[in-house]
């Protein structure tokens, strides 16, 4: 603390005797009060981590002056924690293990090397679907009994049967559908779905496909998983969430998020850097979450801040009351649509206004998770009373929540309506009252219709010419009524009659309120005396057993069943509309009357395959509207003014009479859904699973590298490590490895996905006695530098001007031969010839990818000369000790008359500074100047040390 210039801001937290914090609100009160909440979180991190070297005092004052300095001032940011998915976690932890080896060779204690902040690694990306054929059984007795290593599954809330017991349903269990066709992630279906009898909430034997895929997952990835387990034993600040537990964003939101962190009595706001694209979801909880690449996350783990350009912050004011018929999905999609149209790309969006309190945490996190849809970096909901209530419901003890509230009030991070609102770069307004429910159809999902306009639109479709929407029904036939007998009762069918109504939750699992709304609507409908006509084929496909648990625990499942919405199975409901044909009498009546019969579905937007041949119009609607239209029996209805039906007493029942209020839905969600969801996940993580628990892992401080391993290998990043960094050496007679054009992406540099059979990486694996089906993917082998280096620039779409055609080839200048990039680089390194890359504009576009910088370094590349860089990749090059040089404005290799077959010599001065001009000489006599594209002194320091890894390692020597 004594080295921190802001130490004077530290004070005890009111009401506690053992907790202190930086009261950043006292730094400059007036300026602080005008800051957006998300910027206040950044300021607190800078103040708390200020060391005068990587984080400077001036950085804090630049943030206080945010509105004037945003978009051009860069500030360092250290998160409270780091979250890794397994593909990015492997190389990061391999580097930490290698660093321990390196400092131990200098006689230092390797136990010193640990992540500087809490680091959570979630192993959710390793599963591949080797088997997709599920057991579809008429009863459980036909499913093989599982005797060994059953993974943990959620239990039914009701009475359970033994593993070998038979479900004695008269109708039989229809089982799960094809996993390969499931909507959403198939991996999530396997990892998160308890295997329950869909009719009776009884545990059943696991589907054969899931069991085999999980078994193969552990066998195929055993080395990686053993390494992860060693990490949990060897390193402080590292926790691993094993496979079969949940996806990164689910675990981050439901288990890892703290809102307020505490370390040795010191408290501060939670914030996270995550390598999963869904990291931004936690911004809905008031936790600043940023999605980053592997090198940025690794830097933060090493205690090195990432660089943020102070962003514009768009204030999104939510006003008005939510339309009673609008579901959470309507609200979420409408807000994201507004943001997309407003153009918020690259900004932080912060929500305020009296409408914010109407959004549940599930709504907020869904909006925050959809950042990629509208291009924002962050969609931030400051902590408020809704957030604090959510924490209590998810198992955080009352005393802790009280402490959080006291702290957040002290540093003015608790959003309240009666305080001064922050200043924003720009303010958008969204009136929640303007959000109305929509349905889509009748032929295309992109044709959206307000529910209020549904009757008018359907009648217009009857008149329109046959085409994208029209059916061209003659006016005299539009009022036709066709009598039909079904189950000894008489009915009449007309245009718009509903004959299929299917509720699915494939796309609604992340926000259960819409399914609860449907269930509560069904309950009220039954209590009001309404029924669904028996000829309408109704069905319910929950998407996962978790949704069934919600519906059962809240007591609404029997009411859905009473209306005919019986559960037909889990996963993808392909069978909806196709399992059994419509009753013959109904089909005959539709055909004879040439009726435009309708199906109403929720969930799947690709609904063409769900249609029966006699159903001309298909509409997509939210689950509660599916129930409503089923009750009405027609889509040709104005739900605002026309009754759904009559009860036994002849009283008309309108939708407004039975539609559950938002408050009712939220109460059920908060009392039933959220507590069960979080307690189940917590139990699952604490118990872990049998396979993980039985997995052997070393107990040593240093990792015992297996030289035969093709997954885990000690990287050579520290092989030349010295206590004192050597002075910058001149680069003499360097050859060009690659001469590239504009917009070269990180995928060109380090391709993801499968390993081609003819690639250098494949040849290496074959030499290790692997056959092609054992190659796995580049992602799975990120812990093996030999594979990843051979995969560098191995993209088939790479265009190298030295070769003149696409492919992972280059021209080896000394021999005059065209060969694989890796083979050429290997020859150059044997000859001790330094290498450079020449490129055009926007070098390093695309996803942040650590091996796009690590790979070139291991190929022997010491310099890249480009017209311009994608900033993140340029930072990665610096982080690996590769000098990013930039042609002067208006110049490039072509204008300078370079062929890239010359030899290049240049020297970076010992007193190198950011943007230093450097002279480059060629063996042909040509000279030109470039700019050293270092943006700050920290980058120069990292480069002089040979990269961030060496910089941090020397701190331990």
Curated annotation (Swiss-Prot):
Pfam families: Aconitase, Aconitase_C
Cofactor note: Binds 1 [4Fe-4S] cluster per subunit. [4Fe-4S]-binding affects RNA-binding activity, thereby inhibiting activity of the protein.
Post-translational modification (record): Ubiquitinated and degraded by the proteasome in presence of high level of iron and oxygen.
GO terms for MF: 4 iron, 4 sulfur cluster binding; iron-responsive element binding; metal ion binding
GO annotation, cellular component aspect: cytoplasm
Localization: Cytoplasm
Family of this protein: Belongs to the aconitase/IPM isomerase family.
Record protein name field: Iron-responsive element-binding protein 2
Provenance organism: Xenopus tropicalis
Lineage: Eukaryota, Metazoa, Chordata, Craniata, Vertebrata
